């Protein structure tokens, strides 16, 4: 097809200014930009200068083709800065490693966003020391690589750092790396028990969001009670903990975050055999530090620990909590009123339950928590119910005792239509303490 001037449409694209061509290529997937290099030397020059680079080894014919292409794009003789570099790859143990050089080249070209992901756990991929002094870096994600020790860190612009299943030479490296990022706001650290770091200290004056995960369960029962987490982050607004190994969680100089997601065990299985009194002190101090939280999500594992804790002393109060998402084991559900009593101003409650058997019993305290009398507006049972006696007793408990309830939502998991009909009839028989309550049934 020709234009009025007799120039082909393909030539019209080639006549575009350099900066516009570069912008067009930057908006294409990197693998598509690579293909344009065969059009001409000019197109090849532009395709190798795009600032957004994403390479996945699965899109190439093996690791060495992947490595050859990445080499070409990360040539340090090019003057263009790299806005983002993302590498996702795996290699066999005998394959030559180029990762250290690739990252070093990206640092030289003033990379701002770096994302390195390895799928294989064979061998170690070492990052270069130059990464520790990359003054242009804004976000960093490292997965399954090895971090060397350092003498100096300067990451003045780094705001987001995700460190997933990496290898560290000692506890101090990770602590110093985190504390050496003066504007860090978002931190995600995932470890397993082979990562060496047993005592994780997070110290940051700028941190707003913190996600910590430690998976010890996949390695079986690790007979070691020296695992510990210490958090000193006064500006923290979101905290997520997933940890089945650490015995102690210390929140030092932390103003209670607005939102927390807690799935921890406090190593309570071994503590029962050793010193549960000490664990009670750790649990008490931890949740007292969270007393100002507004939005809490809690796992069934943590709730089970708290149920055991409440045999000896009451929970701390959470006067500011307005939203609570809780996963309850059926055996702990009788403690629900006690939990709610600790949340006097709660407005929204979502419950995730185990499946009840038809004749399972549920005994709930006759005392009515303050939040049911004055503040609770929304309740949802997230797990589908089938009409078991214990399930219906729980539904009845909320409908008959919640004075300001606006909406009660439940899901049905019945196998037959007649079972659903029985549940609907029973719901209609329940007295509602709140005249304005809407019952929503999802089938």
From Swiss-Prot:
InterPro entries: F-box-like_dom_sf (IPR036047), F-box_AtFBL13-like (IPR053781), F-box_dom (IPR001810), FBD (IPR006566), FBL13/AtMIF1-like (IPR050232), LRR_dom_sf (IPR032675), LRR_FXL15/At3g58940/PEG3-like (IPR055411). Residues 361-412 form the FBD domain. Transmembrane segments: none annotated. SMART domains: FBD, FBOX. LRR repeats lie at residues 139-165, 166-191, 219-243, 275-300, 325-353. Keywords: Leucine-rich repeat, Repeat. This is Putative F-box/FBD/LRR-repeat protein At5g22670.
